[in-house]
Amino acid sequence: MAEAKGKTDTRRGYFDVDGSGAMTELIFMLELSGPMAAFESDLIDGFNDMIARLREERSDLLVWLYEEAGKCMDFNTRVPITEDSALIEQGCFTRLSTLAEEYRRAHPEEFIHQDNVRGSGCLFDVGGCIHMAQQVYQTALPEDRPMRTMVIIVTDNTKIESESGDYWTPDRLRELVEQQEKEAGWEFVFLGTSINAKQVAEDVGIPAKNAATFACDAAGVRENFASLGVMILEFSATGVVVPTWAQKISEHLAKTQSGRS
């Protein structure tokens, strides 16, 4: 493995709290509940390959990882990228879906309202995750905060409800996102399939330039993480999201669409 190029952040916070010297925090929210379920292994392999490549270049990254399938979630928070828990275990999403279905069969009364009203709006679950990270950030001393934070959302959910009865309405989510962008300098990235990702992103306060629609096939799922890895390296070094970060994702989508026409 090549020597990591990341500089150690000598501020007291991260060096003393977890020994990672982390300067950049990456918050991944990965949802697999719809058409991408057939490509679970590609998502996991693509994500793990990205983490492995990032490790070769930088050791100063912290990873939050939220995995969701069938409204069942698992997560790790503030994991140094060098630790095994920054990776996803094979079969993770299948396990979550199975647990969710078992709970649903045992407690059907809890899902009546969701089935009739809520739909499958992925971003409402995202709101809770962002709020959790926000609370950690706000309660930390300034020297205990990362220099940069990026929130990366990858979903195959195709329905965004505006009248759901859920706390996280689009307006509330947009307020939360814009607050973190303005007050803390966070960057948000949104990748979605079978939806207009740029429009959905803008509806909740994420800049369209930080969003892309991807092809729901094995190559498209893997390309997400190949492109994200390159973009993350640039962001961790400069704090800038390059405008062309999603070019290969969009090119593959266009190729698959032209093949179907």
Where are these regions (language model features)?
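Acidic, low-complexity intrinsically disordered regions
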Residues: M1-S261
